[in-house]
Amino acid sequence: MFPHRKDVAFIKAKHGKGAAQNGRHSGSCAQAPASRWKQVLLTLLIFIALLALIGGALWQNICYNRTHYTAEFYQVHSRKLTQSCRVVFLTDLHLREYGQDNCDLVQDIHSLAPDLILLGGDLVTYGEGSNYDNMLSLCSQLNEIAPVCGVLGNHEDELYFLDGDQALVEKFTAAGVTILRNQEARYTVRDNVISILGVEGSPEDFYNYGASTFMDSVEPQTDYDLRICLAHVPTYFPEHLENYSFELGLAGHTHGGIVRLPKIGPLYSAEEGFLPDYAGGSYGLANNATLIVSRGLGDSSWVPRINNVPELSVIDID
């Protein structure tokens, strides 16, 4: 028995509606992959843009740190000083120049009006030739501002001991710098007698090259108003030097840890490895002295400073 015409019409209409729905479903499936590709492309573009922003910020930071420095001010109290004095401490310049013939650096130091200028070593870089004219010129200019005294760093030691540049210390002396190699220098500043101790080498050299003998020999002295101890490597102090009497220790060498991470601090130093304890700033020692570790003014490795502005240290002592 055949269906009536109305029934046939209803069946056709029903099949037509189903076909239309099937058509819509197949269109959605075709559009879904295209939508996903758009999302992937958008995510990729956002990621590339973020990388570009971060890379640009890092590059700007690196370039800034190669041409700028900051003066970091420290306050140290002394029990015996009758009048306050100011010390400028610079270290790890590594032949870098700030302005023609370091004119910007010299002008800034002159404006700070220091009573003493102390050097922490590594004004030169081992392996970069033997032309130290800019460093010697800087020393001569500094000597016109205030007495200049300092120690050698590991780069000067390598030039002296490995390359046999015996004239290096003589060049410093001719430029007006007193270089202390396990020696003491004394200065009278504003009626105060200031004793400067210069310890040579690194902590592992303490008992081998005269540093321990020197420190033992000056320990009984009390005829001074302030004693400052200089050593290039900061770990020298907690390992050995804090067993002796002085009020202020000064060191450099670490370049501020190269990279300084927000809320974490310095990333690396040669002596202490990752996350070093002594890589820039002020620290208390067991002998109640203050240790100031400068971030230094230059670089000697291919790794750039990041978030780590070079430092000129200014210490006011009262």
Where are these regions (language model features)?
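N-terminal membrane-anchoring alpha-helices
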Residues: 1-81
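Acidic, His/Gly-rich catalytic cores of divalent-metal-dependent hydrolytic chemistry
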Residues: 24-27, 47-70, 285-318
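Beta-strand-turn-beta hairpins that frame and shape the catalytic cleft
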Residues: 74-88, 177, 184-198, 222-228, ...
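Membrane-embedded segments
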Residues: 84-178
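Active-site neighborhood of phospho(di)ester-bond hydrolases with catalytic His/Asp-centered motifs
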Residues: 90-91, 116-122, 147-154, 180-183, ...
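Solvent-exposed loop/turn segments at secondary-structure junctions
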Residues: 93-95, 123-126, 154-158, 185-187, ...
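Binuclear metal-dependent hydrolase catalytic cores centered on His/Asp/Glu-rich metal-binding motifs
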Residues: 163-177, 189-231, 237-239, 302-305
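Conserved beta-sheet core of the metallophosphoesterase superfamily
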Residues: 234-313
